[in-house]
From Swiss-Prot:
Domain of life, per lineage: Bacteria
Classification via InterPro entries: Aldolase_TIM, Thiazole_synthase_ThiG, ThiG
Keywords of the record: Cytoplasm, Schiff base, Thiamine biosynthesis, Transferase
Gene Ontology CC annotations of this record: cytoplasm
Documented EC number(s): 2.8.1.10
Pathway: Cofactor biosynthesis; thiamine diphosphate biosynthesis
Organism: Legionella pneumophila (strain Corby)
Gene behind the chain: thiG
Family, similarity comment: Belongs to the ThiG family.
Classification lineage: Bacteria, Pseudomonadati, Pseudomonadota, Gammaproteobacteria, Legionellales
Described purpose of this protein according to its UniProt entry: Catalyzes the rearrangement of 1-deoxy-D-xylulose 5-phosphate (DXP) to produce the thiazole phosphate moiety of thiamine. Sulfur is provided by the thiocarboxylate moiety of the carrier protein ThiS. In vitro, sulfur can be provided by H(2)S.
Subunit structure, as described in the record: Homotetramer. Forms heterodimers with either ThiH or ThiS.
Predominant cellular place of this UniProt entry's protein: cytoplasm
Identification of the protein by name: Thiazole synthase
Length: 262
């Protein structure tokens, strides 16, 4: 179990709800993933599934904690207004804060992000800021009152994995008491393992599951990957060596010669 913003959870995998082929695929993937937290955008237009249920009706059946986001916002004012609407609509003070500054790589706008985070925290929100792995930006967000950081592994939807493991490892070292969750860029289960082996608290992903050939099966794979990576970190991985080291100790006399000499 671990604590995320006051909620006791067993799964360290957070999953998005966009881009699935159908509501049925989304529901099955979320079920298979074992996640207890799903992200949703209030700017999403509701759509009917194969069985005629709306997106919102389908979400209610999942019995997960909701993490609304401010996707599509370009400045602090828009993000703050969206967060207030989300709090009213979903009855939660959680908000995944996204303020995008570039259309090419969907990189966060750092100045507006910090501004929005500070105001929202003052208004009683638990802010989950989507940010880059920049150490100074993350420090400013912590100074603003953020108890959670969600740095990217790579640009949203790129599937490139961890493009700067050193920067992420540095964040873990510098912020030992901050909840760190990788958000964006994860493309395959091995990336999730790598994240958790660095000591991160969780992984948030969407596209890697939603656009897989078999979303439900991929969700299962990510479920096990996150568990494996976390257990590897807790178990204490051996250090790398520059030279070989035999796993079986050698002695001068083979054991069968020793037996014959008895």
């Amino acid at each position: 179990m671990w604590n995320l913003a006051g909620k006791e959870l067993s799964s360290r995998l957070l999953l998005g709800t966009a881009c699935y082929p159908s509501l049925e695929h989304m529901q099955q993937a979320i079920h298979n993933s074992g996640t207890e937290v799903i992200t949703i955008s209030i700017k999403r237009q509701t759509s009917a599934g194969l069985d005629g249920e709306s997106f919102w009706q389908a979400v209610k059946k999942l019995d997960c904690h909701l993490l609304p986001n401010t996707a599509g916002c370009r400045n602090a004012e828009a993000a703050i207004n969206t967060a207030e609407i989300a709090r009213e609509l979903f009855n939660t003070h959680w908000i995944k804060l996204e303020v995008i500054g570039d259309d090419y790589n969907l990189q966060p706008e750092p100045f507006e992000l910090i501004k929005a985070a500070r105001i929202l925290i003052d208004r009683g929100f638990e802010v989950f800021p989507y940010c880059t792995d920049d150490l100074v930006l993350c420090q400013k967000l912590v100074d603003a009152g953020c108890k959670i950081l969600m740095p990217w592994g790579a640009p949203i939807g790129s599937g490139k994995g961890l493009i700067n493991p050193y920067a992420l490892e540095t964040l873990r070292y510098r912020f030992p008491d901050i909840t760190l969750i990788i958000d964006a860029g994860i493309g395959k289960p091995s990336h999730a393992v790598q994240v958790m082996e660095l000591g991160f608290d969780g992984v948030l992903l969407n596209t890697a599951v939603a656009l897989a050939n078999h979303p439900a099966l991929m969700a299962t794979a990510f479920r096990h990957a996150v568990i494996a990576g976390h257990q590897a970190f807790i178990g204490g991985m051996m250090s790398e060596r520059n030279v070989a080291h035999p796993s079986t100790p050698l002695i001068d006399t083979p054991f069968w010669h020793q037996v014959n000499n008895l």
